[in-house]
UniProtKB/Swiss-Prot annotation:
InterPro entries: EIF3B, eIF3B_RRM, Nucleotide-bd_a/b_plait_sf, RBD_domain_sf, RRM_dom, TIF_beta_prop-like, WD40/YVTN_repeat-like_dom_sf. Component of the eukaryotic translation initiation factor 3 (eIF-3) complex. The eIF-3 complex interacts with pix. Interacts with mxt. WD repeats lie at residues 207-246, 293-331, 334-369, 442-484, 530-575. The lineage of its organism: Eukaryota, Metazoa, Ecdysozoa, Arthropoda, Hexapoda. GO terms for molecular function: RNA binding; translation initiation factor activity; translation initiation factor binding. GO terms for cellular component: eukaryotic 43S preinitiation complex; eukaryotic 48S preinitiation complex; eukaryotic translation initiation factor 3 complex. The keyword Magnesium does not apply. Residues 1-11 have a biased composition (Basic and acidic residues). Residues 1-36 are annotated as: Disordered. Belongs to the eIF-3 subunit B family. Residues 15-25 have a biased composition (Acidic residues). Residues 595-645 form a coiled coil. This is Eukaryotic translation initiation factor 3 subunit B.
Length: 690
């Protein structure tokens, strides 16, 4: 056809020399096309009807209870309530035998195939009761497994990928700590640099552009660092911070690691609240998910110290889940009417919770042992407005800050409650003593902050007015009431930051950017009082040797950066960084040495001083030598550049003389120069005198 049109056109206009014959697109005789229909029309063929059409939205539920006809309706209501959470159910069939008794399985048809797939994903292996655990499958899966080929084909061997050593950061012979610095380079693009805090200057390990969209977070033992992205989050680790695992959860805003780094919890928003997913870190598998309402307090998960349990607070109850199955402990929640808050012990499987006052029944703080659910201590409290639970890091003590009132005022409908005559109690539970005795400390002033010494038996309190507060230090000992050991008066601090190793504390005012470093073993002397204007964060390194204060661009846009101090408050580094976001020290895993071995090392520490000091001197000498060599190299480079320019200037002398009227201006004396002063009017002012 194309050839015929070409001949007609040629006859009509034979004189048109620009016209060229159209190419012939006809296939030659015997041509065989090697492109399959799937490659050419894959998108259209995917829509053709298949034999499975009509049953892909059907699920088969096995291991349901076998009941008589009189109990069938109740069974249907229970099962339909579960399965209707994942879509509209069109049809349900419960096969029965001759006596009308169910056979232990059922068929359910959803409106859409995607709903059936979601039901299978969520309800497979769901435990209905102690004797029945669902086995839920798609109806099409039966056909798929029936068509398994009889001849077995061995799977293809995949090459083993050697994973980077995740704990190489603790193998440094000098035990230098690492930290990361994040700075926003563009909207939703954050650059993260990883550094090692070596002497005399930190060493840059790695810098990643566009590493995260918002911020980063270290895992509790420092093994992983997590980054946030639109599709979800990812964890990185190893010597070069390779991607270890990714967790698809769009819009994730916050994550939590379990204390032993076995699980990760992601929190992401939904139209009705937020979705919470618990992941297995090693496999990347989703262990369980929850959809919570908008109340963040009720949706926060708290882990036991050994990762064996995770708990959340519900309405008048605590839900405790066992790992790795994530079923409720004993398949039921713990009913606690009026519960307002709870917290795990950091070293034992003990939960502390408090219950509000109800109908003339006093408020109560309870310690419960898990998994026995045995109450090991109760403490009744009267006239309670609120409570806060503060565990000491070693688990030796629990402090309950009790906000108490002298008078309660309610409106007619009891909708608005006002507490008058507020005062505060600190109930100290001695967890390691017999029958867990409780001591009380009362303070009649406003409480601004409370902090335990992580390793030790002291706690500190900021109380009084905001601009002129007092800082009190108490010491807790066995068999006696907590004693006030020091009070620092007229301080303007708002936060307290103890060193991870105890003894030293930073009293910070994060509104004004002022800091005071205090040594609690030397009569609480203030060793230094530096300022860092607009500083909004304070970070101790894991060893308690360094402190960093930072000004984040999340708070201000000018003069962002961080300062590094020694534990005594001496400034050692100032860094101004545009759009600085956050500074985080890399955590360390707990030591493998026993307490006896640690005490022995501390006792004989003087033996190591000479070796340490010699090593420090060599390091500083090496650093000084490197600095001198660097300066010498820079000087040589400059002199080489200078000599080249002088030689070039000398070569151009004849041309300069020619351009300047055959006058050698290079050797002119200053006496031969005429100086002429030119004056001109710049401004004129008129002043009237009386």
């Amino acid at each position: 056809m194309a050839k015929k049109k070409s001949e007609e056109h040629s006859g009509a206009d034979a004189n048109d020399s620009d016209y060229q014959e159209e190419p012939n697109f006809e296939d030659p005789p015997g041509f065989v096309d090697n492109i399959s229909d799937e490659d050419l029309l894959g998108d259209m063929l995917a829509q053709r009807p298949s034999e499975a059409d009509g049953v892909e939205s059907v699920v088969v539920v096995d291991n349901i209870p076998k009941v008589e006809p009189v109990r069938l309706e109740k069974l249907k209501s229970v099962i339909n309530k579960l399965f209707s959470n994942y879509g509209d159910i069109v049809n349900v069939v419960y096969p029965v035998d001759e006596e009308g008794k169910t056979k232990g399985y059922a068929f359910m048809e959803y409106k859409q195939a995607s709903q059936a797939e979601e039901a299978v994903k969520k309800l497979n292996n769901h435990r209905l009761d102690k004797n029945h655990t669902f086995a839920v499958n798609l109806f099409t899966d039966f056909q798929k497994y029936e068509n398994i080929p009889e001849k077995w084909e061995p799977p293809t061997v995949q090459t083993f990928k050697v994973q980077s050593d995740l704990y190489n950061f603790i193998n440094d012979p000098d035990t230098y700590d690492q930290y990361c610095v994040a700075a926003e380079t563009a909207p939703n693009c954050v650059q993260v640099g990883f550094w090692q805090n070596v002497l005399p200057e930190p060493f840059e390990l790695e810098t990643r552009e566009r590493f995260t969209d918002t911020f980063v977070k270290w895992s509790p033992l420092g093994t992983y660092v997590v980054t946030f992205h639109k599709p979800g989050v990812a964890i990185w680790g190893g010597s070069s911070f390779q991607k270890i695992q990714k967790f698809p959860h769009p819009g994730t805003q916050f994550v939590e690691f379990s204390p032993c780094e076995n699980y990760l919890v992601t929190y992401g928003p939904t139209p009705t609240g937020q979705k919470i997913i618990i992941w297995d870190i090693r496999t990347g598998a989703e262990k369980r998910s929850f959809v919570a309402d908008g109340m963040s307090v009720l949706s926060m998960f708290r882990w036991s110290h050994d990762d064996k349990f995770v708990a959340r607070m519900g309405e008048n109850s605590i839900h405790i889940y066992e790992t790795p199955s994530f079923y409720l402990l004993d398949l039921k929640s713990i009913k606690i009417p009026g519960i307002r808050g709870f917290s795990w012990s950091p070293t034992d499987n003990v939960i502390a919770y408090w219950v509000e006052e109800q109908n003339q029944i006093p408020a109560r703080v309870t310690l419960m042992e898990i998994p026995k659910k045995r109450e090991i201590r109760n403490k009744n409290l009267f006239h309670v407005a609120d409570c806060k639970l503060h565990w000491q890091k070693s688990g030796d003590y629990l402090c309950v800050k009790v906000d108490r009132y002298s008078k309660l005022k309610k409106d007619k409908k009891d909708l608005d409650v006002k507490f008058l005559g507020m005062f505060y109690n600190f109930e100290i539970f001695h967890m390691r003593e017999k029958e867990i005795p409780v001591d009380s400390v009362e303070i009649r002033e406003l409480i601004l902050a409370f902090a335990w010494e992580p390793i030790g038996n002291k706690f500190s309190i900021i109380h009084g007015e905001t601009n002129s507060s007092n800082v009190s230090f108490y010491e807790v000992n066995k068999g006696v009431k907590p004693s006030l050991v020091k009070r620092l008066e007229k301080k303007s601090c708002t936060h307290l930051f103890w060193s991870p190793r105890g003894q030293f504390i930073v009293m910070a005012n994060l509104t004004m950017g002022t800091f005071e470093f205090v040594d609690s073993t030397n009569d609480y002397i203030i060793t230094s009082s530096p300022d860092h204007f607009r500083a909004s964060e304070v970070e101790w390194d894991p060893t308690g040797r360094y402190v960093v204060t930072g000004v984040s661009s999340w708070k201000v846009k000018e003069d962002t950066g961080f300062n590094m101090y020694t534990f005594q408050g001496r400034i050692i580094k100032r860094t101004i960084l545009k759009n600085f976001v956050q500074f985080l020290w890399r955590p360390r895993p707990p030591t493998l040495l026993s307490e006896e071995k640690q005490k022995e090392i501390k006792k004989n520490l003087k033996k190591y001083y000479a070796a340490f000091e010699q090593k420090d001197r060599l390091r500083l000498t090496r650093a000084s030598k490197e600095l001198l060599e660097k300066r010498s190299q820079l000087r040589e480079t400059f002199m080489e550049y200078r000599n080249k320019r002088i030689a070039e200037w000398a070569d151009q002398k004849s041309r300069r003389i020619m351009l300047r009227g055959h006058v050698d201006t290079d050797n002119l004396e200053t006496d031969e120069v005429d100086e002429e002063i030119v004056e001109f009017l710049v401004k004129e002012e008129v002043t009237l005198l009386e």
